[in-house]
Structures are given as structure tokens and as C-alpha cells.
Amino acid sequence: MTTYRRTGILAGAALAWLALTVPVHAEVRSAAPDAFQILFNEKVAAPPSAVYGAIGQIERWWDGAHTYSGDAANLSIAMQPGGCWCERWAGGAVEHARVIMLMRDQAVRVEGGLGPLQNLGVNAVLTFLLKAEDGGTALTVGYRVNGASASGLDKLAQPVDGVIGAAVQRLKRYVETGKPAP
């Protein structure tokens, strides 16, 4: 078997695994070479105030596998306009995003290209919307990314969808159980 064929099989298996791990209530709303938009809707069995507070405790629910340092404990979000969603460790630091909107118990919005998107010079906005519903919270998370058509963002939409979808699930579990992983 040639290296190219093996690589193709492995890539296909990885994409299939990603598709299976994305929650059914997630959606890549649109994807083009210069933009994509993903959206998640989740019901959280806790009031909006608990969800809002937990968003600011990102080090407790974000997956360390999706950090530069390998440890989510190095993450923080300064919950104020202009606040940094930062990662700091002995070997370096990264500003992942910046807080651009806060509405207590209703919304959190940050601007920044997460992970490999940072190197592409994209404009990216991640929004958490919270609404009291049936004794809990209707949580809507959207990520809108725009850049140059040469960025090939359509190829990144599904993997980013998988990472953000997993993060939404971890946030939900953290709020409901105090533990981000099952």
C-alpha cells in the first residue's frame, strides 16, 4: 500500500471519527473557502447565571488537548470588555481571543481565531447566548470565521466544529456535574 493511500485512509477514518463525535444538535451552517459558520444548541440543566459563571472558568472545562501547553489549567478568561482569553505557561503565552461583549447571564462574545485559525489572519467571533428555559438554560454557541479565499476555511469547518462541539459538551457537563469529562 502506498504512503498516499494509507494517509488517505487514515484521514478518512479521522474525519469519520470527528463526524461521530460531533453532537447531533451541532451544525456547520455554511462553509466556503473564505468563511464558515458553525452553530450549537444545547439545553443545560442549570440557570443562566451558572452557565455564565462557568464560561469564565474555562480552565475547568476546556480540553487540555486543544491548548498549546497541553494543560487547560493554563487558560483564563478575564470576564470584562477587552479581557484576554489567554494561555500562560513557563514556556510561553498565547492570546486566543479577546472579550468584546458581556451581558450578565445572557451573552459572552469573544473575538479571535482559535488554534490553527490564528495563523491565517482571520476575523473570528465566538458567541455564547443564554436564555432561561424550562428551569434551565437554552445555550446557543456560534462561531463565525471570515478570511481570505486562499485560507481554505471550508476544509477547516468540520474539524473546528468538532473541537467547539466537544467544548460545548464539556461546558454543559461541568455546569451540571462539576466535571467536564464523562
Name each model-derived stretch.
Residues 173-182:
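Short, highly charged C-terminal tails/helix-capping segments
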Residues 115-162:
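Beta-strand/loop substructures that line and gate deep hydrophobic ligand-binding cavities in soluble
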Residues 17-25:
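C-terminal segment of classical bacterial N-terminal signal peptides
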Residues 60, 70-115, 177:
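Glycine-rich portal/gate segments that line the openings of hydrophobic small-molecule binding cavities
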Residues 24-74:
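Hydrophobic ligand-binding cavity/cleft-lining segments
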Residues 40-42, 95-101, 124-132:
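Hydrophobic/aromatic beta-strand elements that line small-molecule binding cavities or substrate pockets
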Residues 51-54, 85, 99, 110, ...:
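Hydrophobic pocket/interface hotspot
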Residues 2-13:
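Bacterial N-terminal signal peptides that target proteins for export
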